[in-house]
A protein has these predicted regions:
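AMP-forming adenylation/ATP pyrophosphatase catalytic core
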Residues: 1-179
Length: 179
């Protein structure tokens, strides 16, 4: 079997997605020099060189905001706190006003469950090795100005269920269009 040149393989991969020859050269150069974090754009696709891999993401036509599903429960002896990161369990009496959902912003801080001090959301995502695409798609659920849940990741410690909690809110996300 004949060896395939890496540049030919890259061309077969990216050309059908709309990346041009100059971009192919830059992508290959980025791979050869082990440059992470580089982003390349075609008309309908974005390519990210992240650590040792190439990640492709189709550009969204519209940014669909997911719905927050809220279930309220009274805390009793039969209640078991869910351990899935897809469900946040928070103290309902600590919530101020309506819950809102939005994308995270630079400078956002929260207190990750189990920690005592505030942490920037950007630092949390870097520590967890989020890709640029994952960071761009990250949602937060807020009570007023406070982040109560970094969606599908971690709740805020200030809203945790304690021995004094009477009512809990179980939060989950209903996502459409593969977001």
């Amino acid at each position: 079997m004949q060896d395939i040149a890496p540049t030919s393989l890259l061309h077969e991969l990216v050309a059908p997605l709309g990346f041009n020859a100059g971009q192919e050269h830059d992508i290959f150069h980025c791979m050869e020099n082990n440059q992470s974090g580089k982003v390349f754009h075609a008309s309908h696709w974005t390519l990210l060189r992240d650590r040792e891999v190439l990640i492709f993401q189709k550009k969204d036509v519209a940014d669909v905001v997911p719905q927050v599903h809220i279930e309220e429960k009274w805390l009793d002896d039969s209640f078991v706190i869910p351990r899935q990161k897809e469900i946040a369990c928070i103290d309902a009496d600590k919530v101020k006003g309506p819950l809102t959902i939005r994308r995270w912003n630079q400078g956002d801080k929260f207190v990750p469950l189990g920690m005592s001090g505030k942490k920037k959301v950007s630092d949390y995502m870097t520590d967890r090795k989020f890709t640029l695409f994952q960071k761009e798609r990250q949602w937060v659920v807020c009570s007023g100005e406070d982040i109560v849940w970094l969606v599908n990741e971690r709740s805020d410690h200030r809203y945790r269920v304690t021995e004094n909690t009477r009512r809990v809110l179980l939060l989950s996300i209903k996502v459409k269009d593969g977001e």
